[in-house]
């Protein structure tokens, strides 16, 4: 889901590689020299969100994680590009269209480079990368409309209403970026160098506030697109496009996600320009102002996107009985994390961690829409007990303590429990790996700590979910003193979870009432 911190990316020129072919039995032929490898520019990188570690991060990094999760869904819904299609025939595969990566020093007069310092050349490269990225973005947005939207509308593959939902306000973004590209070209000197970009950015960046509606729509757009892929005509059309050279092996959602991906890169791009700008350059002050502007816009869009995603999933909760409804769900504006789970009986569940309540559901189809039917009563976070289970403590089938299955330990389990009077629940959850298990543990602990602190209880949670009093240093369990004392009869549901997009944004709740989590669709037939 996430990886390491990623420094500012500048495309690099790849060296030619020669291939030595073994001699053939026929007439000898010179081995052909392959063409240069080409590197996809910044706009082709799926998301810097994939390059951020699961630790405390800056608001900007948390936002990129949030948006990435907002459009990350089950891989099962994606077409298998390697699978043979009935209409494929045995024709020679068409060559994939690639976009050349360009450097400023390779594009303009080399003599100019010799007159500039190394620092200034790096500054020009960063400015050129900004400009080239705008050009690539505009080209891709126009391609999405021309190659996907318009043909599907003309061929009645989707209705106009469905296409409007999926493409959102994409059309309105094109003129914004055309304006910036035009201004950047206007200030470029005949020799290719650019002296000042700060004033242009300060004047242009505020228009990116219009991204809020586009980004807020992405969760619903992705859900509808995944649903429409079940239609044979839609799947066939998208597969043909994917295998066509113009797509560069990118599917439709890759194109629709490019604006969001570009948005979260602006602070990095501007910081790189600023890093190579001398202190006495008038551009420095303007660049610092521009960075503050874009970070404010990113934070605001982060908030609105989080609220939109939270609303989306709340609207798709199905209650089996009136008693399952909880005011904590209705009042939630933050979805910390959610993911598909599987219990030790093989039952798939989908768990949502809102800011103050944990909701366990089963994914079902209702009126041709993916919905989430509540599986048990919602669990208030403040009363939730969390336990990190050692490998081997849970066995498929429900047995506990040192159990084994086929001589292999059952790994990556943790348990959430709740007891309030006559009501009690115990759920043993299994993550798909150690990394995702730790993400869930961190997120639940952070959510619980935030709720308890908001209630006026100072302290922190230890690794076992116990609340530590900072004054006495003593451990105070919220609820029963030991999880083993809880009722584990018919209220137990041992779950296993696929949490490749679990959110670590719970810390964000301490600073704002909004946050988003990951989104991943799951289907469960129980």
UniProtKB/Swiss-Prot annotation:
Assembly mode: Interacts with RHOA and RHOB.
Keyword annotations of the record: Cytoplasm, Guanine-nucleotide releasing factor, Phosphoprotein
Disordered: region residues: 20-40, 464-526
Major localization class: cytoplasm
GO cellular component: cytosol
UniProt name for this protein: Rho guanine nucleotide exchange factor 3
InterPro entries in the cross-refs: DBL_dom_sf, DH_dom, Endocytic_GEF_Adapter, GDS_CDC24_CS, PH-like_dom_sf, PH_domain, PH_RhoGEF3_XPLN, SOS1_NGEF_PH
GO molecular function per UniProt: guanyl-nucleotide exchange factor activity
Domain of life: Eukaryota
Gene source species: Pongo abelii (Sumatran orangutan)
Transmembrane portions of the chain: none
Gene: ARHGEF3
């Amino acid at each position: 889901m996430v990886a390491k911190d990623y420094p500012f990316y500048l495309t690099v020129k790849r060296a030619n590689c020669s291939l030595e072919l073994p001699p053939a039995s026929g007439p000898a032929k010179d081995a052909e020299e392959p063409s240069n490898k080409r590197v996809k520019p910044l706009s082709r990188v799926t998301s810097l969100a994939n390059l951020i570690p699961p630790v405390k991060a800056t608001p900007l990094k948390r936002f990129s994680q949030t948006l990435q999760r907002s459009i990350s869904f089950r891989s099962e819904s994606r077409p298998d590009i390697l699978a043979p299609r009935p209409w494929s025939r045995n024709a020679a595969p068409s060559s994939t269209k690639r976009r050349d990566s360009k450097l400023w020093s390779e594009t303009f007069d080399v003599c100019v480079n010799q007159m500039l310092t190394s620092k200034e050349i790096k500054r020009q490269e960063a400015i050129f990368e900004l400009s080239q990225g705008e050009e690539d973005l505009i080209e891709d947005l126009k391609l999405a409309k021309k190659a996907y939207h318009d043909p599907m509308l003309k061929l009645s593959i989707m209705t106009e209403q469905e296409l409007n939902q999926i493409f959102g306000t994409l059309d309105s973004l094109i003129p914004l970026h055309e304006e910036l590209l035009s201004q950047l070209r206007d200030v470029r000197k005949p020799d290719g160098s650019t002296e000042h970009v700060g004033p242009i950015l300060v004047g242009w960046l505020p228009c990116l506030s219009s991204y809020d509606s586009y980004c807020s729509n992405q969760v619903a757009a992705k859900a509808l697109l995944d649903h429409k892929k079940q239609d044979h005509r839609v799947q066939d059309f998208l597969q043909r496009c994917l295998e066509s050279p113009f797509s560069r092996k990118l599917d439709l959602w890759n194109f629709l996600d490019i604006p969001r991906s570009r948005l979260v890169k602006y602070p990095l791009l501007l910081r790189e320009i600023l890093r190579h700008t001398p202190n006495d350059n008038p551009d420095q002050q303007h660049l610092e102002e521009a960075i503050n502007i874009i970070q404010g816009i990113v934070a605001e869009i982060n908030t609105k996107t989080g609220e939109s995603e939270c609303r989306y999933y709340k609207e798709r909760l199905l209650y089996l009985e009136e008693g399952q409804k909880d005011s904590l769900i209705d009042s939630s504006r933050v979805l910390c994390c959610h993911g598909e789970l599987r219990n030790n009986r093989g039952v798939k569940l989908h768990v949502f961690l809102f800011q103050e309540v944990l909701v366990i559901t089963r994914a079902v189809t209702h009126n041709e829409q993916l919905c989430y039917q509540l599986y048990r009563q919602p669990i208030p976070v403040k009363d939730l007990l969390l336990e990190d289970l050692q490998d081997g403590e849970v066995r498929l089938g429900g047995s506990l303590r040192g159990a084994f299955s086929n001589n292999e330990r059952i790994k990556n389990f943790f348990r959430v429990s709740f007891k309030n009077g006559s009501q009690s629940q115990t759920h043993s959850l299994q993550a798909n790996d150690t990394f995702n298990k730790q993400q869930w543990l961190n997120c639940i602990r952070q959510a619980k700590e935030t709720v308890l602190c908001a209630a006026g209880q100072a302290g922190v949670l230890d690794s076992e979910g116990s609340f530590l009093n900072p004054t006495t240093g003593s451990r105070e369990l919220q609820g029963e003193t030991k999880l083993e004392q809880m009722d584990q009869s018919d209220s137990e549901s041992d779950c296993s979870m696929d949490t490749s997009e679990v959110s670590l944004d719970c810390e964000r709740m301490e600073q704002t009432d909004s946050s988003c989590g990951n989104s991943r669709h799951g289907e469960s037939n129980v």
